[in-house]
Amino acid sequence: DVLTSRGLGDVYKRQDSTGRDVFTRVLFGGRVSIFIGLGSAILSAVVGIAVGCYAGYKGGWVDVIALRISEIFMSFPQIILVLLLVSITGQSLFNLMAIFILTGWGGMYRLARARMLSLREEEYVQALRSFGLSTFTICYKHMLPNALSPIMVNITLSTAMFILTEAGLSFLGLGVPLNIPTWGNILNVAQDILVLQNYWWMWGPVGIVISVFVLCVNFIGDGLRDSTDPSQQG
């Protein structure tokens, strides 16, 4: 029996009910889960920064429209909005990433917008305007680098959030298709009470890996915040 043939000392050689090596699936599934989490965080940051920088600098009707759209997305609980969009678009890896980007750009937009609102009154920005530089050059070449510190921290936190969301959706069978190994899909077997009670190696190691990885990502975010925020430095 592939489920009971090995002892505790051979945890890393354990297999699931179909004979697939659990350790290998955790490693390969980690690549997919990290790709989803980090890719979604970076792309949602690109969208949020692009819109937030321009809207925060220019103001006017562009800022009003972008702000209202972001408020619409942020007014719904994210998990409910994700479930609704998954039911409409269907299950696939890239559909899930697109949904994460669509529901996650608002927070980055508001952060970038707030930084631009504070920076656009700085003297160096007034000087750049007097030189006749274009809006694009002022926003994205000169102002954006001064706003990157909180943005980098937010990207790390978004990565952890998207990985946890993917794991939760895949555990419920609503995330990435089950034929693609992800940490959430590996956890999916724990829906069976028999597996949950008797075959801990099929879900326990991946649960620990998810927890440790998310904790490490959050530590990286805390370190970036402490190193870039002068108020956190002694």
What does each model-found stretch correspond to?
Residues Q15-G234:
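Alpha-helical transmembrane segments of integral membrane proteins
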